[in-house]
């Protein structure tokens, strides 16, 4: 099989040969015709006249050389086009196939690398999950037969109650009140454990004494009564609920005042004020009147 350069050189040589042959034939024909027309003697044969008339193109001496040269040039151009274009097309096709194969290999390698990265990321998490929790050194954990799968892990030194403290005599058990002495540098705190009777703690210095909050206990001295229906209205103020004045629709105008029933017109200010009770009719000393005309 010839190479591309050799094929090009041969086709160019053939084209030059064809063109030379055509030019030579055309020149020979023209010279012979010129000589025939300018001959000194004219010989007429039978049926011929000395007149000039139209002649066929095929009878011209230049017809066949010109037609042959044109056909040769067309053939040479076709051969050159096919000889040059077919190898170029095949070369491009091979390059496209090679690029496609390289792209496919690159995609496969990227997929393999991605799978390796996923497996490497999953393996450390599995190793962390499979590791068993280790107990710290120097800690003795007692066996608890009641602990199950869904029960929280409880340190037996502290017990199930987080408020319990370590007791050297019985691990996990509640401490008795007032078993620990006062630590230096700390204020003595009252016992926080339950089971103590009320009102056993004395008043702490620096704190105001609070009234009792438990029911059924007598009030402390110097404190007003906290039971309902025992508070009398203070001078200058309206009676409070439960202070000896019943509530409901029996209250009069204003705010829970006995007298007139409650209704939409219970507040008739600014003309009537708020219907003060008899012991609140006058203003307080040093203050202007609160309701009614001024």
Swiss-Prot record:
Adhesin necessary for successful cytadherence and virulence. GO terms for cellular component: attachment organelle membrane; cell projection; plasma membrane. This is P32 adhesin. One of its GO terms (biological process) is adhesion of symbiont to microvasculature. The chain crosses the membrane at residues 11-31, 66-86. Keywords: Cell membrane, Cell projection, Cytadherence, Membrane, Repeat, Transmembrane, Transmembrane helix, Virulence. Residues 172-214 are annotated as: 2 X 22 AA repeats. Pfam families: Cytadhesin_P30. Residues 234-294 are annotated as: Disordered. It comes from Mycoplasmoides gallisepticum (strain R(low / passage 15 / clone 2)) (Mycoplasma gallisepticum). It is found in: Cell projection, Attachment organelle membrane. Disulfide bonds: none annotated. It is a multi-pass membrane protein.
